């Protein structure tokens, strides 16, 4: 099946701008907020959110990267050795950490991120921002900030393309799998 575009670059930009405003509003400013992108596509999304917050609030929000490769509960089914990225985190203590990811699906990625984050420190609070929430949760996890809710079937896949990673124009597409 041909991929169906659900969001274009302008719709993604608007959704991220709204999320940035919601983060600031929910936390009474951005002075104690850190953004942590989940490797891969959560990282550029976190950087974009930080830039948008800096633009309106004139505050430099620390941005970190979290690679959950060794914390996944499906390591045994992913092949002999996971490909690991890097984890670089700002100071966590007494800060609100907003985890950032592209798509929220079963909740297992977020569970792994929470487990790894707790190994690095204890923030005052953890919130979750996602560009797309597609439903079908297997764990009791809910995003605090959502760009767009997109109901999907189990045999569909939501793909996010970002210019920083995919060398393509930003888009969100849905693809039916066989």
Curated annotation (Swiss-Prot):
Record's function text = Regulates the transcription of the pyrimidine nucleotide (pyr) operon in response to exogenous pyrimidines. Also displays a weak uracil phosphoribosyltransferase activity which is not physiologically significant.
Q: Which SUPFAM superfamilies match?
A: PRTase-like
Q: Looking at the record's lineage, which domain of life comes first? A: Bacteria
Report the sequence similarity comment from the record: Belongs to the purine/pyrimidine phosphoribosyltransferase family. PyrR subfamily.
Which keywords describe this protein according to UniProt? Glycosyltransferase, Transcription, Transcription regulation, Transferase
Q: Which reaction does it catalyse?
A: UMP + diphosphate = 5-phospho-alpha-D-ribose 1-diphosphate + uracil
User: Could you give a GO molecular-function term held by this entry?
Assistant: uracil phosphoribosyltransferase activity
Disulphides: none
Entries under CDD domains matching the protein: PRTases_typeI (cd06223)
- EC number(s) of the enzyme? 2.4.2.9
Q: Does the keyword Nucleotide-binding apply?
A: no
What's this protein's name? Bifunctional protein PyrR
Q: Where is this motif: PRPP-binding?
A: 97-109
- BP GO terms, sorted: regulation of DNA-templated transcription
């Amino acid at each position: 099946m041909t991929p169906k575009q659900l969001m274009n670059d302008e719709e993604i930009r608007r959704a991220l701008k709204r999320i940035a405003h919601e983060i600031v509003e929910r936390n009474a400013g951005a002075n104690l907020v850190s953004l942590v992108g989940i490797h891969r596509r959560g990282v550029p999304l976190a950087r974009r959110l930080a830039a948008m917050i800096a633009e309106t609030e004139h505050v430099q929000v620390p941005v970190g990267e979290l690679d959950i490769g060794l914390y996944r509960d499906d390591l045994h089914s992913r092949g002999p050795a996971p490909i690991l990225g890097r984890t670089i985190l700002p100071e966590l203590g007494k800060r609100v950490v907003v985890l950032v990811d592209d798509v929220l699906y079963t909740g297992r990625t977020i569970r792994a991120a929470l487990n790894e984050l707790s190994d690095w420190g204890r923030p005052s609070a953890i919130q979750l921002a996602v560009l797309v929430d597609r439903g079908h949760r297997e764990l009791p996890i809910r995003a605090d900030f959502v760009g767009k809710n997109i109901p999907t079937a189990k045999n569909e896949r939501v793909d996010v393309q970002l210019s920083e990673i995919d060398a393509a124009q930003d888009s969100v597409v849905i693809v039916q799998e066989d």
